[in-house]
Regions:
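Intrinsic-disorder/low-complexity loop/linker signature
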Residues: 12, 27, 54-55
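Long, low-complexity acidic tracts
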Residues: 1, 40-42
Length: 109
């Protein structure tokens, strides 16, 4: 039996395992991949990427994994284009993410 657990994020999008998402932290945001969903707590485990340059993201040498409340996920279905040699890729919608983060920040931070 396969159990699909999902939650809705800030925009109302459903969040699933393996989704690439943007997460609000303090006065900035980070891009990462949902690794695990803790259905009983509205929390997800996310493996974060590092910002390399102008919209490019890659996986850090040392894994950066954290458990995050779904309320901090403000953008889901982030599309990574053209994965590089270290994985990751270019975030095609970086301007949209930044704009929505500003709105999120004004509403919640």
């Amino acid at each position: 039996m396969v159990l699909f657990i999902s939650f809705q994020n800030y925009k109302g999008d459903k969040i699933f395992c393996d989704d690439t998402v943007a997460v609000a932290y303090n006065n900035t945001y980070y891009i990462g991949e949902v690794q695990k969903i803790h259905g009983d707590k509205r929390e997800v485990e996310i493996k974060f990427m590092k910002r390399a340059r102008n919209g490019y993201y890659s996986w850090p040498k040392k894994e950066d994994v954290d458990t995050v409340d779904v309320d901090f996920i403000f953008y889901s279905n982030v599309l990574l284009v053209g994965a590089g040699k270290e994985g990751g890729g270019y975030v095609d919608c970086e301007e949209d993410i930044a704009e929505l983060f500003d709105k999120y920040k004004n509403d919640y931070m």
